[in-house]
Amino acid sequence: MEYLRIAFLFALTALAEIVGCYLPWLVLRQAKSAWLLMPAALSLALFAWLLTLHPTAAGRTYAAYGGMYIAVALAWLRVVDGATLTRWDIGGAAIALAGMAVIALQPQPT
């Protein structure tokens, strides 16, 4: 069960970061309302707070988080941007998630 909690927390953290970066991108690249910067800032603050909830050292958290970020970013690419994922996208995400699992699920010293 702990593994699922860690994976969910990584996915939620990645989503908060992606939303926090995507909204300013809409403002700057697609001339959307500057009001989108407010929820973007809140989302990035949520992202920073969520990072503090991870149960391991910050550097290890960031390293493991990167794998989940890749997978969530590709899901965003498919769902929000409507792009078709390639086998290279899927294979790369699988490799990144395997790396995340090695780092995040390593035995903890007693």
Swiss-Prot record:
Topological type in the membrane: Multi-pass membrane protein
Superkingdom, taxonomy of origin: Bacteria
Compartments reported by the entry: Cell inner membrane
Record key words, sorted: Cell inner membrane, Cell membrane, Membrane, Plasmid, Transmembrane, Transmembrane helix
Coiled coil: none
Pfam (any one): UPF0060
Protein name as annotated: UPF0060 membrane protein RSp1275
InterPro entries per record: UPF0060 (IPR003844)
Protein family: Belongs to the UPF0060 family.
The keyword Cell division appears for this protein: no
Stored NCBIfam families: PRK02237.1 (NF002586)
PANTHER family: UPF0060 MEMBRANE PROTEIN YNFA (PTHR36116:SF1)
GO cellular component, one term: plasma membrane
Annotated source species: Ralstonia nicotianae (strain ATCC BAA-1114 / GMI1000)
Transmembrane stretches, start-end: 8-28, 33-53, 63-83, 90-110
